[in-house]
């Protein structure tokens, strides 16, 4: 009978130790995976092009000048 109780004590000790080890190791692994995924998610968000609504608004030029070829040009009479 003593042999069985010794084996049971050993088994319970091993199981408790492995359970504590899993509790310590698994959260650190999950944190490392989430840290690795974060830059990847940021990169994919940058790569996805969002629709841009471009509104053509003519720029204001000072009096006596006109907007020609993306610049304000002075009109000489």
From Swiss-Prot:
Record keywords: Disulfide bond, Secreted, Signal
Cystine pairs: 61-72
Tissues and organs where the protein is expressed, per its UniProt entry: Expressed by the venom gland.
Cellular compartment(s): Secreted
Keyword Coiled coil: no
An example Gene Ontology CC term for this record: extracellular region
First and last residue of the signal peptide: 1-32
One Pfam family this sequence matches: Secapin
Propeptide: 33-52
Transport listed as a keyword: no
InterPro entries documented for this protein: Secapin
Functional description taken from the UniProt entry: Nontoxic peptide.
Family as reported in the entry's similarity comment: Belongs to the secapin family.
UniProt-recorded name of the protein: Secapin
Upper lineage: Eukaryota, Metazoa, Ecdysozoa, Arthropoda, Hexapoda
